[in-house]
Each structure stands twice: as C-alpha cells, then as structure tokens.
C-alpha cells in the first residue's frame, strides 16, 4: 500500500493552514505526527480521510485520489478516530464498537463480526466494559472504545488524532505499543497525532514533525528529533539522549528565543521523503 500527499494546501478563509505539503508513505508501519498546537496536524488528517477538501493538491492511495474513491469503498480503506468525541450512544459498548463493522457487514451482524469486536476489546483490556452503557464511561474509557471501533473497521490506513490524550501513562504506553504491533499483524499503515515525543519516538517506525503549516522534517526518529529541531519547532531547549536505541528528549528549563521568520518548508515535488517501514 502506498499513499502520496502531493502539493497539499488547505486554508480557512484567507488563512493557509497547510502549505504545499509533499510526502509519500509506503508499507505497513506506525507513524507519529508531532508538532505544537495550531500547526495543521489535525487538518492534515482531515484532508487524508477526505473530511476536508484542500484548496490545491491531493491525497492518493495506490495512485487514486481519495476524492475519486466512492464513500463506501473509502470507509473500507481508511479508518478515522478523532481526538475527542461528543458521541452519545444509548447502547452498550459491544454495540457501539460493532458500528465499526458497518462498511463490511452493513447492518447485518454475523458471528465473525462479534468475534472481531471481542478480540479487540480484549486486546485493549476493556472487555470488562462490553456490557456497560457507553454513556456511563469515563473520558479515557470512551477513548478506548472509539479506538476499538476504528480497529474493528479493519482499514488499510488508520488515522488517529491523539488516541492517548485521555489515558494515564501506563495506558498511553500500552496503547501505543499495541498500535505498533497491529500495524505488523494487520499489514496496516497507522498514522497517529501525538504530543508525547518520547512515547511516540519509542514505538514509531517514522515520525513527521510539523511546523508553521509545513513539514519541518520527516523520517527516522533519530534524524528528526534533534536539539535544533525541538528548539525551532517547540521553542524550548533540550538534550537528546539514547535510551534503548531510541532518542529521548530531556527538557531544559529554558524557553528558547527561536522564532524562525524566514523558515521555508524543505520538501518539494522534486525532493521529498518516502516514509517506509523500519527494521525492528
């Protein structure tokens, strides 16, 4: 499976949020999108899954623009789990998760659908919630149920907007590890937005660092997460240490005077990276 983002530009009114993005993705892997608030991370996810329509450029899956793929077929190819949900389902958790099977089974529930649901609930350690009312769950439990719904959809590409934001640190680590494992087991490209740099770099095959509506850097975590990139993008000083073969950010107390007013996104049609699965 290959996905290509070609010259993607998006804006609200006269304000450009994404500016001429170029990047390719190839193979099953876990990719984390990093960057401060307001740089276009969620907007990029929205354009990939065709919720938002770019002003120019396009997103291609195996050579076909997502705008040209019928909605039902696109739902089988791309799953999307938003950062938070205002969903209010007067139903039990099993039924809420079963909604993710709709692109495959429509509204007829088969035994195989139920098995897939329970397998995912067990994997996410929420099988004890199966018969609970969805509306009675905590924010963190809601988030895991929403993730379960995305996983049972079994898409080729799964897009997650801060899937661990309401979870405690143990479950943040556990969910991120599960996502990496599932990318291998299900031959799936999983792209998640994260604000935890250290957890993201510990488990991601590649990372994409966004800044000012563009891609500051993308690739191997060691190539992307550097003292200079953290200083420029986040405006803080730090040290980078090697922890079990992965970069770990140790923050300084200093707020850096970093504003790069002349920064230009480095990737173009002629020169942009292809993010491929790394060797474990």
Question: Which residue stretches match the model-derived regions?
Answer:
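Helix-to-loop junction immediately C-terminal to a conserved catalytic motif
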Residues: 49
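Conserved ABC ATPase signature
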Residues: 133-137, 141
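Conserved ABC ATPase "signature" region
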Residues: 98, 111-129, 154
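The feature captures the beta-strand-to-loop junction immediately N-terminal to the Walker
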Residues: 34-36
